[in-house]
Amino acid sequence: MVKAVAVLKGDSPVTGVITFTQEKEGAPVTVSGDIKNLDANAERGFHVHEFGDNTNGCTSAGPHFNPHGKNHGAPSDSERHVGDLGNVKTDGNGVASVNISDKSLSLFGPYSIIGRTIVVHAGTDDFGKGGNAESLKTGNAGARAACGVIGISN
């Protein structure tokens, strides 16, 4: 089993800790944790971005992790970036409890997400259905509220 963790922070008050686990190569990755200080009763875009570089805040994390050159989509779509995890939903206190199982992510091999950045966005992901070029790249999810580099853990 491989485990990883990311501590989310940014220029906004949004914070969180997200864990990633994968039993074996080829198995789904479980993504879990809590993200706090988001807008209440909202859906916010949640993606793995290409780089583990946060030297210029979340902006330097680059675009969504997309090693296969596909358009942006929903987690259930065949046409999606590897890093497209959809939206996290917040409760009345602005807390999103994350519990995702994703078969496209990996903690093994050349497409591993370890060393990349997980980002929670300030807007809702439209799953590439927004009818414009930006939707096919980012899902129109907006600014990067918080992010963290995904690091191997024990």
From Swiss-Prot:
It is an enzyme of class 1 (oxidoreductase). It is found in: Cytoplasm. Binds 1 copper ion per subunit. Binds 1 zinc ion per subunit. Its cofactor is Cu cation; Zn(2+). It catalyses: 2 superoxide + 2 H(+) = H2O2 + O2. Keywords: Antioxidant, Copper, Cytoplasm, Disulfide bond, Metal-binding, Oxidoreductase, Zinc. GO terms for cellular component: cytoplasm. Its main location: cytoplasm. Substrate binds at R144. Cu cation binds at H47, H49, H64, H121. One of its GO terms (molecular function) is superoxide dismutase activity. It holds the Pfam family Sod_Cu. Disulfide bonds join C58-C147. Homodimer. Destroys radicals which are normally produced within the cells and which are toxic to biological systems. This is Superoxide dismutase [Cu-Zn].
